[in-house]
């Protein structure tokens, strides 16, 4: 089914649910049970069940034909991802700003680069990056392979030119066999580094969350508050207009009215009014681990995020037409936060790989 067809189908489901909610004064009763003796309640249950199906997870991870999955590439990519020798000062790795302990971000309002330079935006998570067609807050990268080498070379980020990166990796004997196993040759090339890191990053997928269990039919998997929040998310609050699909994103760009001089996507589309101050819609999976929020890290909590959308943001020509005051009640706000928290899974710790040494005396060591 095409994206357009999916959106059309979803729109019909939302329209049905909105009509049902409007016809039923006690909305909470419609969602969570209680005294319900009308056909309206049954219709609401059916609409919600249909809507839950729209958020079902795909069965497999997406890997491109030009860079298919192999365990050898994942092993190599993970080592490269955690290796600080991919930075000019030998202190920064991909994992520094995209740390599994912080929802594959860094827990800071703004990223920290070479020489403790404070970057202009928050470090985006790599969770579910396998499914992205365009990356970065402003969409400047067209693939994970393209994105992988960008921060390494950037002066303000990892600060290591590609020729120096190649010389450094070739000077670490243990990397040679790893590249040969993954790509069939020891002569390390930048494209091989990019493909290995990208392959590992595609394995970083959000875990099965309470919301998924509820979607599969376990009514006790989430609270009654969260169930109400799901309906509000899809109706009155209009969150699902941009945060749809199983990843809870439309993969598009919107100006949500944050008071910032950063024009985001507008740098690449200067003549498109609605792209000024527009940033990529982030997915909401594992959201409870990923504070602070927004591209500028300006929202410390999910409660602050909900308040921002409820108020409507800064009015300007580029602001999304969807950004209007919502007039949510305190209960509706709490319900929304409760629902969003159900999108976070109970994942375990990620093991840090043993990195290749400068000599090959320990080439048989295994990962912990």
Question: Which residue ranges define each predicted feature?
Answer:
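Periplasmic c-type cytochrome electron-transfer domains
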Residues: 2-368
